[in-house]
């Protein structure tokens, strides 16, 4: 099926505008995976029902449920279907993201992984207040810990709820307000738009930092939160499937148009690679075939 799949549960305003931009670029798209079709497990494109599975050429990750997104992206990899996604942020958690950004040398707030209430309180005392509790799952926002009473109440509440999901988290130094941060959407390596509510002045330094963060995460489509708590900007957080209905374009293209442009480029690259492979096979076979087929008769 020569179709680009838009990975989502339903088409919201963002996905509808994205599919319209793809159509304007001459690219057929559809919601993926089909709601009524189970996905195959493994490299064969045969659904568990026995029917051929509608495999798209490329998938755009827009799913708001990151657990479902990770599972579907894994299935796509098994089928050999590339994805336009947030890279490490699409398939990992905040610890994976923080580790990748730190390994790349990008400026980040002091962070500590905590596995218990006691460890989190110790991390808060070490980093100082205010601080922010960042759940490991990408779908949950950070919780500002503005004073000691708030920190103890929040961490105790999570401990009482129980479970490893509630116990695990990152404590990050600082708690930037709206006017101290900017949400920059990076598409195919370029800062493309600002999410609404981004009050921090977004200059060349912030845009370059967001682009560098996207490269560190191997992300094609991601929102990077750049914060300025002190004198220098830092990478605060990322969002693998950002809302962009009210996003303000930095240049000419809207987010939907920029994604459609990136998809068109990716499809052209895939076509060129496929053609080169076919030509290579033809060149490798032809000389032997020509010599074998020549017959000289007296």
Residue ranges and their predicted role:
Residues 1-5:
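Extreme N-terminal starter segment of soluble prokaryotic enzymes
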Residues 7-8, 187:
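Short hydrophobic segments within beta-strands
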Residues 9-111:
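Conserved N-proximal alpha/beta basic substrate-recognition cap immediately N-terminal to
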Residues 83-84, 109, 132, 170-172, ...:
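Structural detector of well-ordered beta-strand residues that form the stable sheet scaffold
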Residues 98-102, 124-145, 163-177:
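ATP-grasp fold ATP-binding core
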Residues 109-131:
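Rossmann-like NAD(P)H-binding beta-loop-alpha module
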Residues 144-217:
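Phosphate-binding site of ATP-dependent enzymes
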Residues 194-235, 239, 243, 247-249, ...:
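A long amphipathic alpha-helix within ATP-dependent nucleotide-binding catalytic cores
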């Amino acid at each position: 099926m020569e179709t680009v799949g838009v990975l989502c549960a339903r088409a919201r305003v963002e996905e509808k505008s994205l599919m319209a931009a793809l159509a304007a670029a001459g690219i057929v798209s559809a919601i993926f995976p089909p709601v009524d079709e189970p996905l195959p497990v493994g490299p064969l494109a045969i659904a568990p029902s026995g029917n051929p599975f509608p495999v798209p050429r490329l998938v755009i990750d827009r799913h708001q449920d990151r657990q479902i997104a990770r599972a579907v992206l894994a299935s796509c990899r098994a089928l050999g279907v590339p994805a336009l996604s947030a890279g490490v942020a699409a398939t990992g958690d905040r610890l994976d993201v923080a580790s990748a950004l730190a390994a790349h040398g990008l400026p980040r707030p002091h962070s500590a992984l905590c596995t218990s209430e006691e460890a989190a309180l110790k991390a808060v005392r070490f980093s100082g207040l205010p601080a922010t509790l960042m759940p490991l799952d990408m779908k949950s926002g950070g919780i500002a810990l503005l004073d000691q009473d708030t920190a103890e109440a929040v961490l105790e509440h999570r401990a009482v709820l129980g479970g490893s999901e509630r116990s695990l988290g990152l404590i990050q130094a600082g708690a930037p307000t709206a006017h101290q941060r900017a949400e920059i959407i990076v598409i195919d390596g370029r800062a493309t738009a600002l999410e609404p509510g981004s009050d921090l002045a977004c200059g060349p330094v912030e845009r370059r930092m967001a682009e560098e963060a996207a490269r560190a995460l191997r992300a094609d489509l991601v929102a990077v939160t750049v914060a300025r708590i002190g004198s220098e900007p830092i990478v605060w957080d990322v969002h693998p499937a950002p809302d962009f209905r009210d996003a303000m374009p930095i240049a000419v293209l809207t987010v939907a148009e920029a994604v459609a442009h990136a998809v068109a480029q990716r499809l052209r690259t895939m076509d060129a690679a496929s053609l080169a492979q076919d030509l290579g096979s033809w060149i490798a076979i032809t000389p032997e075939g020509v010599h074998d087929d020549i017959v000289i008769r007296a």
